[in-house]
C-alpha cells in the first residue's frame, strides 16, 4: 500500500484536490494490527486502492491519533476509516480482515463514492439551469471561494486542541451547509457578509490559538518548576543515601578491622600455645628417643656378648652328622681340637659290625679321608662347627652308598621303597632325634659342653620346626604329637562351638 508521508491536514487537502477517498488506518503493536498491516500490503489490495484513494497510517500512541479520535471515535485497534468528500465515513473496518475481504470492502467504497459523485453533478446542473441572471451565475463562484476558505479553516484546527476542533467543526459544518446551497447563497447572502463572517471566524481562531499558546507556556513553566523541584528532591535523596551508605561502609570497615585485630590476637595466642606444646612434645620425644637408644645399645651389647660367647662355644665344639649307607643318620658333638679318629671310633661303636671296616668321607665337597687325615683335628679339616660325613664300607666305591640285596625281589622293593624310607628317616631324625648317650666315662666329660651346644642348636631349630608345622597345618591335623591327613569332616568339626555345659552347638 502506498501510504501518504505527510500530516493529516495535507492528506485531507490532497484527497480534496483529487476528489479521492481519504483512508485512515489506525494501527497498534498487537498481533491483529500486524495481520491487518500485512493485508494492506497485499498485492491485490495495492491494485484495488491504486486509484481514487489517499491513505495514511497512524499509530495509536501518536498525537495525530488523539486528534483524529476527537472527531472520529476509535472503538478498537486496528481500525480502517474510509471518509468521503463531505467528511462522512463511507465504511469503517474494525479489527483485522483478510486481503480478499479488504479488496471487497474497497470495491464497495468505490461504488458508494462514484454514486455520490454522480448525485452532486446532477444537483449542480439543476441549480445552473434555474439561475437566469448574470449576477446569479457570479454568486456561486463567490460561494465556492467561501467554501474553499471554510474547508481550509476546518483543516487547520485539526492540529490544535480538541475544544477548538469541535468549535471550529461546528462553524465549518454551518458554512458547509451554506456552501452546499449555491442558489440560496446567490439570493440571500451577499459576498460582503461572507467576508465579514470569515474574518470574524479567523479572528476567533487566532484568539483561541493565542490562548492555547499562553496555556501551553504556563503549562511548560509549571512543568519546569515541577521538574526542578523533583530534581532537587532527587538530589537531596541521593545525597542522603550516599551519606548513609558512606556511614554504613565506615562502620563496617571499623567492625572488620576490630574483628581482624581480634582474629590476629587469637592466632598469635594459638601459635604460642602450639609452639609450647610442640617444644614439650619434642622434649618428651627426645627423652624417649634417648631412652630407646640407651636400651637399644644395651640390647646390642648384650647380643654382642651372647654372640661372642656362642661363637666361642661354636668354635670349641664340632657337631658331626654321620650318614649311614641305608639312609639313616645320627649326630654327636666333639671338641673342635679332637682328631678325626675320635669321631671314627664313635661311629664304629655306634654302628658296630654292621658295615665292617669303613672309612669316612664328605659329599660337599667330595672328599674321602685317609689315614693321615684321621690324625688331624676337626677344626683343621674344616669340620667345625658342623659337618656331615658319610660312612663308606670297605671295598665299595665312594659313589656306591646303598648296598645291593641278594635277591631280585628285595632289590626291586628296596629300589622302590628306598626314597620314601630315606625321607621318613630324615624327617624323624630331624624332628625327634636326641643325642646318643655317652658310652664311656671318659667321653662323658667331653660331651657335657657339647650337650649345651646341642641344646642351643635345638633352640635355634625351634623356629624352623614351627615354620614347617605351620606349613603342614593346611594339609595335616595335629592331635597331640601325632599328625594325620585332613578330611572334609575335620573342617566341620572345627567350626562347631561348645557351650558352657559341654554340649556341642552347631
UniProtKB/Swiss-Prot annotation:
Stretches for region Disordered: 114-193, 437-506
Domain notes: The UBX domain is required for interaction with VCP.
CDD domains named among the record's database cross-references: UBX_UBXN4
Region called Interaction with UBQLN1, residue ranges: 1-199
Keyword Phosphoprotein: yes
Cellular component aspect of the GO annotation: endoplasmic reticulum; endoplasmic reticulum membrane; nuclear envelope
Cell compartments where the protein resides: Endoplasmic reticulum membrane; Nucleus envelope
Assembly and oligomerization: Directly interacts with VCP. Interacts with UBQLN1. Forms a complex with VCP and UBQLN1.
Intramembrane features from the record: 412-432
The keyword Cell inner membrane appears for this protein: no
Cross-referenced InterPro entries: Thioredoxin-like_sf, Ubiquitin-like_domsf, UBX_dom
Name of the featured protein: UBX domain-containing protein 4
Function recorded in the entry: Involved in endoplasmic reticulum-associated protein degradation (ERAD). Acts as a platform to recruit both UBQLN1 and VCP to the ER during ERAD.
Sequence ranges assigned to domain UBX in this UniProt record: 313-391
